[in-house]
Amino acid sequence: MQRLAMDLRMLSRELSHYLEHQVRVGFFGSGVGFSLILGFSVAYACYYLSSIAKKPQLVTGGESFSRFLQDHCPVVTETYYPTVWCWESRGQTLLRPFITSKPLVQYRNELIKTADGGQISLDWFDNDNSKHYMDASTRPTVLLLPGLTGTSKESYILHMIHLSEELGYRYVVFNNRGVAGENLLTPRTYCCSNTEDLETVIHHVHSLYPSAPFLAAGVSMGGMLLLNYLGKIGPKTPLKAAATFSVGWNTFACSESLEKPLNWLLFNYYLTTCLQSSVNKHRHMFVKQIDVDHVMKAKSIREFDKRFTSVMFGYRTIDDYYTDASPNRRLKSVGIPVLCLNSVDDVFSPSHAIPIETAKQNPNVALVLTSYGGHIGFLEGIWPRQSTYMDRVFKQFVQAMIEHGHELSSM
């Protein structure tokens, strides 16, 4: 490492002398434009390779899980090369929804009933053409949980399915109540602390295919919900393993970060309007218990949660809700192998709130922390239209757990 630093300093000095010489030549000759462009390109490449492209930090609670990931999910130990012209957190976060493609995935929709009379929309990708698992009863099943206002149509969900389709697995996307176009039958939506709907979905899917390996993956709020479920239930779950991406570990820290002026302008206010739009669509269902007009005046996610979410789910205060919603406090109780990918520059999930010490105390948990990637960004390649680093981590981990998961118990 010291040798590399010395080489970079020497290269910088030589580059400085070169640029100075070229500028002098350019003033009295020609070609200064090309020389400057070449020089700055070399300088940028040196900076990128030395400061931006880095291997992720792998934090595990046990040596066995660490060795397992190194052997069967090597992407978590390889250098992550963010898109060279867009590696900053906000840039990655903003760009991904617009630049990544949306692969065609043919879903089969199913509406299931809940105990309170509501309904949940599930979108299935059965993968009936699977050459590896032709018997549907034993075909591995992966449950996907989208983010705060997301559905099965999100590009990151589509890419997770598309990239892994060749593995032959079956996928089912859990759409939260009222967001996927279905009618809201009861005055209740969703939040990341109440796991009742997720428990209903997991029970339903497992009852359909009890002999099939069953895994789950959650993105952003979907990951928070999944971790809260796993922390509550411990090892008594039909899930074999799980993965989360861009989880907000401490809801208070997330809210504080998103309320900073620039983050509020770029992300917070927009997401608040998305939440309000969903409420307004089903306004007639809430008028008896919620002051909807007051909710529609909220200017931040925190204000929305104070006026709507915390009230709907019976919390005395917004602080009570945010405490219960934070998955960091339940991580120690997770009883199955879980891989959690976060970027330390994610403004939705500040690095200081990532529970590194707690993860070290649970042999079932692995944190994969990249230096860059933003929130559900993880763009890579010159023109990042296709799969991301997150998609590759998902594919390798799911495949590792389904094909080699038995090795963990023997390590």
UniProtKB/Swiss-Prot annotation:
Signal peptide: none annotated. GO terms for cellular component: membrane. Residues 140-247 form the AB hydrolase-1 domain. Keywords: Hydrolase, Lipid metabolism, Membrane, Phospholipid metabolism, Serine esterase, Signal-anchor, Transmembrane, Transmembrane helix. It is found in: Membrane. GO terms for biological process: medium-chain fatty acid biosynthetic process; medium-chain fatty acid catabolic process; phosphatidylcholine metabolic process. The keyword Hydrolase applies. It is an enzyme of class 3 (hydrolase). It comes from the Eukaryota. InterPro entries: AB_hydrolase_1, AB_hydrolase_4_CS, AB_hydrolase_4_sf, AB_hydrolase_fold, ABHD4. PROSITE patterns: UPF0017. One of its GO terms (molecular function) is monoacylglycerol lipase activity. Pfam families: Abhydrolase_1 (PF00561). The chain crosses the membrane at residues 25-45. Phospholipase that may play a role in phospholipids remodeling. May selectively cleave myristate (C14)-containing phosphatidylcholines through its predominant phospholipase 1 activity, cleaving preferentially acyl groups in sn1 position. In parallel, may have a minor phospholipase 2 activity acting on acyl groups in position sn2. In addition to (C14)-containing phosphatidylcholines, may also act on other medium-chain-containing and oxidatively truncated phospholipids. This is Phospholipase ABHD3. It comes from Bos taurus. The lineage of its organism: Eukaryota, Metazoa, Chordata, Craniata, Vertebrata.
